[in-house]
């Protein structure tokens, strides 16, 4: 009877430790994407996406500070998407990929642009 309980406690303890690791990895990935966007000149050529990426990464760090790792992961992923969109827009090598990345960064603005009503 005690063995299943101990196994359950061990698994729960192991899973509890995954949140900070995954969040840290996502934040580091977003920071790399932001640096790549900076190198491409996104601060001047893709101001909207650049600013969004930086605000999302700040919010990710804030949520991690409150131990809300799920929100931290979500905001870090959003920061990566926006930084990627900023980099693609700044380099202007593939306009279709840049537009797709921009829509991933801000899907609500893509809906407005296409004429869909706002919910």
Residue ranges and their predicted role:
Residues 18-119:
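Long, charged/polar, soluble alpha-helical segments
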């Amino acid at each position: 009877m005690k063995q299943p309980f101990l196994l359950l406690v061990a698994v729960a303890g192991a899973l509890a430790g995954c949140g900070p690791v995954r969040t840290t990895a996502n934040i580091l990935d977003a920071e790399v994407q932001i640096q790549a966007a900076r190198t491409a000149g996104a601060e001047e050529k893709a101001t909207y996406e650049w600013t969004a990426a930086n605000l999302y990464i700040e919010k990710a760090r804030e949520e991690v500070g409150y131990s809300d790792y799920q929100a931290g992961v979500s905001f870090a992923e959003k920061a990566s998407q926006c930084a990627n969109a900023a980099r693609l827009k700044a380099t202007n090598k593939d306009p279709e990929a840049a537009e797709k990345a921009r829509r991933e960064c801000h899907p609500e603005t893509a809906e407005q642009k296409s004429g869909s009503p706002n919910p």
